[in-house]
Amino acid sequence: MVLSSELLASILAEVRPLLGQGKVADYIPALAQVPADRLGMAVCTVEGELFTAGDAFEPFSIQSISKALSLTLALTLYQEEEIWARVGKEPSGQPFNSLVQLEFEQGIPRNPFINAGALVVSDLLETRLTAPRQRTLELVRRLSGNPAIMADQVVARSEYQHSARNAAIAYLMKAYGNFENEVDKVLQSYFNACAIRMSCVDLARAFIYLANRGVPLGAGEPLLPARTTKQVNALLATCGLYDEAGDFAYRVGMPGKSGVGGGIMALIPGELCVCVWSPELNKAGNSLAGTAALELLAERLGRSIF
């Protein structure tokens, strides 16, 4: 089938009956207030064409999707070996906020997309930047072409007030010598990134560089080298959807990154970036209807990286 807004609308209509079968994230009180019936989808091609359906323009909390943006920012500031000396490149097979594996592996997180790994990346940003929160916002505004993007401070505060487990993860890494800055300061920057509000359209545009050999939408110069972009995509394919990455690869067949706000970003290198949003999550913490929508999109377009 040919990519069109009508195709996206038909896919959303097909997955809409799934609404009510998942559960909105409630361990972050501010996220629990998001209406469960929201459903949106946007696709941006490497040529800049945009296709939308449903609530594609409504901003939501990107949560762990921000981990891919933070890693990108770190890769512009550090030699890659400096990053991979402190965080691994392997799937975890454990819950995203697990302490058990971290203890067993002496404070080196499995990958940059679980909480421990993202906290190490945030620690790296804190070391190298005087204003990491502002630099992260500047990056997403530039990549998406939307200067109005902000972090929701109500969500950020809500996460900070319920941050005992993330603090425990950070202090455990500090005990193993894998955390340089004040834990409290890094946590606040980390939660601020998670609390950034973007729409499906914003995200589909922002991540097009991963589908375009490192070159952002409308830019001449690459943000990342093509080789590094390929490596980030490999990590997204193996680690981007918590401990459901294998099932997502099997069903959808695209590199992707999810967040407990209900968003999923996925891409086909050389072609397009897609973002879908539905706040109700499955047991693995990924959008239930969103995953189904991406599976249908891959099927209808006959596209996969495999």
Curated annotation (Swiss-Prot):
EC number: 3.5.1.2
UniProt similarity note: Belongs to the glutaminase family.
Assembly and interaction partners: Homotetramer.
PANTHER family referenced in this protein's UniProt entry, alphabetically: GLUTAMINASE
GO-annotated molecular function: glutaminase activity
Residues noted as binding substrate in the record, renumbered to the chain: S64, N115, E159, N166, Y190, Y242, V260
GO biological process: glutamate biosynthetic process; glutamine catabolic process
Organism: Aeromonas salmonicida (strain A449)
Protein name (Swiss-Prot/TrEMBL): Glutaminase
Enzymatic reactions: L-glutamine + H2O = L-glutamate + NH4(+)
Sorted UniProt keywords: Hydrolase
